C-alpha cells in the first residue's frame, strides 16, 4: 500500500473486473489473476500513486500500460512474474488476451472521456501521467 497508496491494488481489481466482464460477454481471457497482478506490477507506479488525488489516474495508467505492452512486444515478452518463476506472456493465448483487454480498456477510457464532457480525442492527453 505504501508504495502506491493503494493504487496498484485498485489497478489489479480493475483488471479483474474487466476480465470478468469480458468472460461474461463470451470472450476467452487466458490471463490469471496472478498474471494480471504481475502485469500491473511492472506499470508506472508513480502514475498509480497519483490515483490517491486523481481518481482517473488508475484507469488511465492501466489503459496506457496495456496499450504500451500491445505495441512493444519485445518489452512485453521479457516481463517476468514478481517472484521470477516464469515469464508472464509464456503462450500466444495470453498475448491475444492482452489485446482483448487493451481494447476493452480503450473503450472504457473513451466512454469516461465522453461522460466527462471531453468530446475531442486530444483533450484527455492533458492528464498528469508520465511514460
Regions found by a protein language model. Give the residues of each.
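Glycine- and acidic-residue-rich phosphate-binding/metal-coordinating active-site segment common to enzymes
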Residues: 1-9
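Conserved nucleotidyltransferase catalytic core and NTase-mimicking acidic/glycine-rich helix/loop elements
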Residues: 10-128
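Acidic, metal-dependent phosphodiester-chemistry machinery of nucleic-acid enzymes
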Residues: 131
Amino acid at each position: 500500500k505504501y508504495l502506491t497508496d493503494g493504487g496498484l491494488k485498485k489497478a489489479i481489481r480493475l483488471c479483474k473486473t474487466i476480465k470478468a466482464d469480458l468472460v461474461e460477454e463470451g470472450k476467452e481471457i487466458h490471463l490469471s489473476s496472478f498474471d494480471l497482478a504481475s502485469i500491473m506490477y511492472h506499470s508506472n507506479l508513480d502514475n498509480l500513486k497519483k490515483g490517491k488525488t486523481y481518481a482517473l489516474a488508475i484507469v488511465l495508467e492501466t489503459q496506457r500500460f496495456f496499450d504500451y505492452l500491445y505495441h512493444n512486444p519485445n518489452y512485453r515478452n521479457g516481463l517476468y512474474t514478481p517472484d521470477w518463476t516464469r515469464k508472464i506472456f509464456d503462450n500466444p493465448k495470453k498475448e491475444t488476451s492482452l489485446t482483448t483487454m487493451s481494447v476493452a480498456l480503450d473503450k472504457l477510457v473513451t466512454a469516461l472521456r465522453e461522460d466527462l464532457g471531453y468530446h475531442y480525442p486530444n483533450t484527455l492527453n492533458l492528464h498528469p501521467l508520465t511514460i
